[in-house]
Amino acid sequence: MLPFTLQQLRILKAVATEKNFTKAAELLYLSQPSLSKQIKTLEKNLDILLVNRENNKISLTENGKIFLQYSERILALCEESCRALIDLKNGERGSLTVGASQTIGTYLMPRVLALFAQNYPQIDLKVQVNSTRIVAKNILNREIDIAVVGGEIPLDLKKNLTVEKFVEDEFSLIIPKSHPFANKKIVTKEDLYHLNFISLNSNSTIRKFIDNILIQNQIDTKQLKIIMQLNSIEAIKTAVSLGQGAAFVSSAAIEKEIELKTIEILKIENIRITRTLSIISNSESYKSKAFEFFSNELKKLKNEIEN
């Protein structure tokens, strides 16, 4: 007989999240005394202290943190097994959680999500947009079923993921319509030193990626004039449209601006800044029919983009 129940694992997870017995009890629709009793019973059965209760502050012990990791995996597997059975019973019904890194989730993913929702309205679709690392981690935790990411996948996570090449994402150099370079179409590396740049902050993975490509092409990024650092692609595009400077932006993010003709795009002589977008999933998790349907929609989008 196991020394714990699924309900006790849910309780431990809620306590870890809320860091408060009363709030955790409310989350699970339990009384606070009942929740406290379940935690004590779990600790007694495991013969390990899981929760610190010092100075009215609730936190997990180191043993509690380790046990929580396994608890979350057990709960995720239980939920996955139920989904598999429902899948067999209901055919094209079910649920799917899709993940995406920031730029993809904002500009590329909505197209496929809209088509998927239209074609499979009976499937409950949820979306998580976050950094590539967090999305990959949530794939492994079975909180996300499938995702499209653009950043480099950390090696410690990548080994347990199925990674499939999706499409190439090119970064365009955009400038205001009023800029003297607007009629050039192609600029040299030397021309870059005469531009005022608007960029993401230096800790951004996209900023680091672009800088690395420029450095590989013998461009001294420290000599580029960065007049403004903003924390969103939308803010950067707006600033460029208003004539405040130039920027490197994913081509997927500027379709509207191209259509409205609010910016100009410049090519850099003999340089292309591209990255590979990847479709990732958990190598060991159950692949539902909803998963298969969504994978097919991604393949359709890939063919549309490449052709």
From Swiss-Prot:
<protein>
    <recommendedName>
        <fullName>Probable RuBisCO transcriptional regulator</fullName>
    </recommendedName>
</protein>
<dbReference type="GO" id="GO:0000976">
    <property type="term" value="F:transcription cis-regulatory region binding"/>
</dbReference>
<feature type="DNA-binding region" description="H-T-H motif">
    <location>
        <begin position="21"/>
        <end position="40"/>
    </location>
</feature>
<comment type="function">
    <text>Trans-acting transcriptional regulator of RuBisCO genes (rbcL and rbcS) expression.</text>
</comment>
<keyword id="KW-0238">DNA-binding</keyword>
<dbReference type="InterPro" id="IPR005119">
    <property type="entry name" value="LysR_subst-bd"/>
</dbReference>
<dbReference type="Pfam" id="PF00126">
    <property type="entry name" value="HTH_1"/>
</dbReference>
<dbReference type="InterPro" id="IPR000847">
    <property type="entry name" value="Tscrpt_reg_HTH_LysR"/>
</dbReference>
<keyword id="KW-0934">Plastid</keyword>
<dbReference type="GO" id="GO:0003700">
    <property type="term" value="F:DNA-binding transcription factor activity"/>
</dbReference>
<comment type="similarity">
    <text>Belongs to the LysR transcriptional regulatory family.</text>
</comment>
<dbReference type="GO" id="GO:0009507">
    <property type="term" value="C:chloroplast"/>
</dbReference>
<dbReference type="InterPro" id="IPR036390">
    <property type="entry name" value="WH_DNA-bd_sf"/>
</dbReference>
<keyword id="KW-0805">Transcription regulation</keyword>
<keyword id="KW-0804">Transcription</keyword>
<dbReference type="Pfam" id="PF03466">
    <property type="entry name" value="LysR_substrate"/>
</dbReference>
<feature type="domain" description="HTH lysR-type">
    <location>
        <begin position="4"/>
        <end position="61"/>
    </location>
</feature>
<keyword id="KW-0150">Chloroplast</keyword>
<dbReference type="InterPro" id="IPR036388">
    <property type="entry name" value="WH-like_DNA-bd_sf"/>
</dbReference>
